[in-house]
Structures are given as C-alpha cells and as structure tokens.
C-alpha cells in the first residue's frame, strides 16, 4: 500500500466521520436567536424557549430533505465500503480500482444531497424559499460538517486517482 492510498483512505475516513456527525447533530439550520432559538436537523429539531431546557423532537421532513438524508446515508455507506476496500488493497491490489469508483459514487451522492437540501427551505419552521433562507436564519454547524465531508471526499479522490502527485 503506497502513501497516496493511505492519505486517500484517511481523507475518506474523515469525510465519513464528518458526514455521520452532520446527520447526528440537529444544527443544519439555525435561527440564531437566544429567545426561542430553533435548530433544525435531518433527524432532530430542537428548540430553546426563553432560557428553558432544550427540547428536541423528530421533525416531519419535507420530501426534499428525506431525499437529502437518503443520499447522505448512501454516501456514508459508499465511503465506508471504500475505506474497507482500501484496507483490502494492501493484500489485493485490484481492490483500489473498485474503491475509487465507489468513492466517486459517494461524492456524487453527497453533491446531489447538497443541491437538493436548499430546496426544502420553504418549510414553516424555516420560513424561506427554495435556495433562499430568511435574513434571521443561517446554516448551522451540521451543514458545515457536511460540506467538509464533500471537500475531503473530493480531495481523497484526487489522491486515490493519483492526480495529486507530489513533485
């Protein structure tokens, strides 16, 4: 196993972890206000009302966000399989070729999720329009983690494809 394969495996693992963390954390969209702060995630929605304890419930997701969640889960599975194949490539060199294609599929799934997610900004909890959040609302840390997972996946693919050769 060469250095570029190890680097790409580490990048795919980091992307996988960031994508899992982005789903687990309910901060995809944040109203940002201290009084009645609302954070909306893909699996949880949390609200803090006037300094009380934070209350979290499972949201009723619009079809666009269900599709986003589905694509992210498939992307996570793809990256997990890719990491496994890169470990196997230590003994069977041809596994690297399959790992690259599966990682590419994961990147496409993540990019599709990133394109579809903003279409759901119209829901009542957010109050925006597709691809346009209201002024008092921002994307949260979970969305940033998800974008980082896309970035690490793309850079990992560059290393796996030996596009980023040193020197």
From Swiss-Prot:
Pfam families according to UniProt: Atthog
First and last residue of the signal peptide: none
TM stretches of this protein: 7-29, 68-88, 101-121, 139-159
Keyword Nucleotidyltransferase included in the entry's annotation: no
Compartments it resides in: Cell projection, Cilium membrane; Cell membrane
GO BP annotations, alphabetical order: cell differentiation; cranial skeletal system development; negative regulation of smoothened signaling pathway; regulation of neuron differentiation; regulation of protein stability
Topological type in the membrane: Multi-pass membrane protein
GO CC annotations, alphabetized: ciliary membrane; Golgi apparatus; plasma membrane
Keywords on record: Cell membrane, Cell projection, Differentiation, Membrane, Transmembrane, Transmembrane helix
InterPro entries xref list: Mosmo (IPR037663)
Function summary: Acts as a negative regulator of hedgehog signaling probably by promoting internalization and subsequent degradation of smoothened protein (SMO) present in the ciliary membrane. Plays a role in sonic hedgehog (SHH)-induced spinal neural progenitor cells differentiation.
PANTHER family named among the record's database cross-references: MODULATOR OF SMOOTHENED PROTEIN
Official protein name in the record: Modulator of smoothened protein
Phylogenetic lineage: Eukaryota, Metazoa, Chordata, Craniata, Vertebrata
Gene designation per UniProt: mosmob
